[in-house]
Design a protein with these regions (language model features):
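Core catalytic lobe of class I
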Residues: 1-191
């Protein structure tokens, strides 16, 4: 399975990091400098590699900001066999950088290939009731340890959210791939 958080091609510095003590600089690439065509090419190449180097039937969770959901749908459609669902991560606080403060992020659930995929929740049959709205506290929530987490990455994904996604579509001892390591949530959860 894949859980990955590619750059969103959105400026970070002065846009996402706000005015607090922790200020983030733009990423090395895909921080708003790419044209739509360049970003499409970037996403398509990344997704093509994810599909090529993962098993047939695997589920790939790919995070993306609402500003580039069209590009993600197009790149995903070109590289995956199916869009299984569009998941909304509903955070408890809105972020910066938009006309309305965004209190959500999208997670695209794509299927790679035609083999059967793992589904450990099957509409609640295994005691796991899951919907396509995932409610997890964002790191910008006022809590102990928040400053350290925010210092790692401007859009840190909650470890519990990634852990649940891993449980949904993989088995113990399976392989989890994240080619955009970001804040390190995946390796932390898989350990």
């Amino acid at each position: 399975m894949v859980f990955t958080d590619p750059p969103y091609n959105v400026a970070i510095e002065g846009n996402v990091s706000g005015l607090g003590r922790t200020r983030h600089r733009d990423f090395a690439m895909a921080s708003g400098e790419m044209t739509r065509e360049e970003f499409m090419s970037f996403l398509s190449a990344a997704l093509a590699n994810l599909a090529a180097y993962s098993i047939d039937g695997s589920i790939h969770f790919v995070c993306m900001d609402w500003r580039h959901m069209g590009e993600m749908l197009q790149a995903g459609g070109a590289n995956y066999s199916e869009l299984k669902n569009l998941i909304v991560w509903a955070k408890d606080n809105g972020g910066m950088g938009a006309f309305y403060r965004s209190r959500h992020e999208f997670i695209f659930a794509f299927k790679n290939g035609s083999a059967p995929h793992i589904n450990s929740f099957e509409l609640g049959q295994h005691g796991r009731y899951r919907t396509n709205v995932w409610e997890y506290r964002g790191v910008n929530t006022l809590k102990a340890g928040r400053a350290e987490e925010l210092a790692l990455h401007p859009t840190v994904k909650p470890v519990a959210m990634i852990a649940d996604a891993i449980k949904d579509v993989s088995k113990r001892g399976g392989i989890v791939l994240d080619v955009f390591g970001g804040s390190g949530s995946d390796p932390h959860r898989c350990s």
